[in-house]
Amino acid sequence: MKGVISQVMGPVVDVDFNDYLPKINEAIEVYFEVEGKKNRLILEVAAHLGDNRVRTIAMDMSEGLTRGLEATALGAPISVPVGEKVLGRIFNVVGDLIDEGEGVEFDKHWSIHRDPPPFEEQSTKSEIFETGIKVVDLLAPYAKGGKVGLFGGAGVGKTVIIMELIHNVAFKHSGYSVFAGVGERTREGNDLYHEMKESNVLDKVALCYGQMNEPPGARNRIALTGLTMAEYFRDEMGLDVLMFIDNIFRFSQSGAEMSALLGRIPSAVGYQPTLASEMGKFQERITSTKKGSITSVQAVYVPADDLTDPAPATVFAHLDATTVLNRAIAEKGIYPAVDPLDSTSRMLDPQILGEDHYKVARGVQAVLQKYKDLQDIIAILGMDELSEEDKLTVDRARKIERFLSQPFFVAEVFTGSPGKYVSLEENIAGFKGILDGKYDSLPEAAFYMVGNIDEALAKAEKLKA
């Protein structure tokens, strides 16, 4: 099982073996010294070159590696710790703790390369995953075991929504979450850890980080590390898990780097020729089974805002819902800044949601769309030139817009107002009332930053006083 390093080209390392040939994806361990410090490096077999030579991808920096160093094939792929002990801790791609906390003995390890659940075990039920966030549950609901794309520029609130979802899953569904930082900025990973600590959600989430400064192997495989931890919660503990990936684009990007390093001929826009199959293999593992489910929320960076770029276009094929954050909405002070007209979901179907929910959702969208169409007239001629019917539409649309805002639990520290979880029934009832004109006499301000409609009524009473 011992081999010798024969070539080092940055993150690509060739290893020669005599009487043993490691399988593709098998892990190889190397110990070496740099400036008197002993380092352990894991390599993953990517190609067989013939003559018992394998080409591997390094999972960490390869500085200090030299030809002739001894390498040991481990006989199995990279395996990472799983189970409840991983909660509240930060791991790197090979499952080592990197949070400088106390050491833990993990009794269970799973390989990061796994097959998706067989068809007969997969659940075919279309169920809604209640998040407690009004705008999401009403207009672009998430599917249990589905995949959601979270689109938004910098500073619009992607991280806050992710943290609120982790909070609501922990407290309402008493479920666990896994966060995979794929090609994240180290600063963002650090901020997220401290924000979670302050918001008291850390003990319900496992964090896996492969930062921007790490080699492509680590940035690519970190997504599999996180997914493996989530699969254990689903398959062995029968839980509904939430899996966050930030950012799924970096998964494709690091795959392209690895592909080029291995000498494969690039495909469109320089991406790897295996882009669609790599993404498919990964996304197929995120699914509902009869035991439990993994619902994933994936932040998607769109290079140069070009939605036809192969990387985001490949992700779209797998998504069940999209939550689009809009800077213009954030500038109005409406948080979460989810765009009610741009966000979509395949769950928005009367056969899944029921006629009532569907009608209210479509009614809300129709009113908001009409308001959007009237904005030019209002800007040029003012409100007085509108017909009575249009004035009423604008009035209701402005109330709906404000009622789509909501105080978050994880933002209590900044806003000073306590967070609210709104159940689906209360959510539908509130918006139905606005559409039916029940609350036409109430001031707009009563609907801003409240939970359910009863709170809006109480706020209106306060404003009167």
Swiss-Prot record:
Gene3D superfamilies: 2.40.10.170, Bovine Mitochondrial F1-atpase, Atp Synthase Beta Chain, Chain D, domain 3 (1.10.1140.10), P-loop containing nucleotide triphosphate hydrolases (3.40.50.300). SMART domains: AAA. GO terms for molecular function: ATP binding; ATP hydrolysis activity; proton-transporting ATP synthase activity, rotational mechanism. It is a peripheral membrane protein. Its EC number is 7.1.2.2. ATP binds at G152, G153, A154, G155, V156, G157, K158, T159. It is an enzyme of class 7 (translocase). InterPro entries: AAA+_ATPase (IPR003593), ATP-synt_VA_C (IPR055190), ATP_synth_F1_bsu (IPR005722), ATPase_a/bsu_AS (IPR020003), ATPase_alpha/beta_chains (IPR050053), ATPase_F1/V1/A1_a/bsu_N (IPR004100), ATPase_F1/V1/A1_a/bsu_N_sf (IPR036121), ATPase_F1/V1/A1_a/bsu_nucl-bd (IPR000194). It is found in: Cell inner membrane. It comes from the Bacteria. Keywords: ATP synthesis, ATP-binding, Cell inner membrane, Cell membrane, CF(1), Hydrogen ion transport, Ion transport, Membrane, Nucleotide-binding, Translocase, Transport. Pfam families: ATP-synt_ab, ATP-synt_ab_N, ATP-synt_VA_C. One of its GO terms (cellular component) is proton-transporting ATP synthase complex. It catalyses: ATP + H2O + 4 H(+)(in) = ADP + phosphate + 5 H(+)(out). Its main location: membrane. F-type ATPases have 2 components, CF(1) - the catalytic core - and CF(0) - the membrane proton channel. CF(1) has five subunits: alpha(3), beta(3), gamma(1), delta(1), epsilon(1). CF(0) has three main subunits: a(1), b(2) and c(9-12). The alpha and beta chains form an alternating ring which encloses part of the gamma chain. CF(1) is attached to CF(0) by a central stalk formed by the gamma and epsilon chains, while a peripheral stalk is formed by the delta and b chains. Produces ATP from ADP in the presence of a proton gradient across the membrane. The catalytic sites are hosted primarily by the beta subunits. Belongs to the ATPase alpha/beta chains family. This is ATP synthase subunit beta. It comes from Campylobacter curvus (strain 525.92). The gene is atpD.
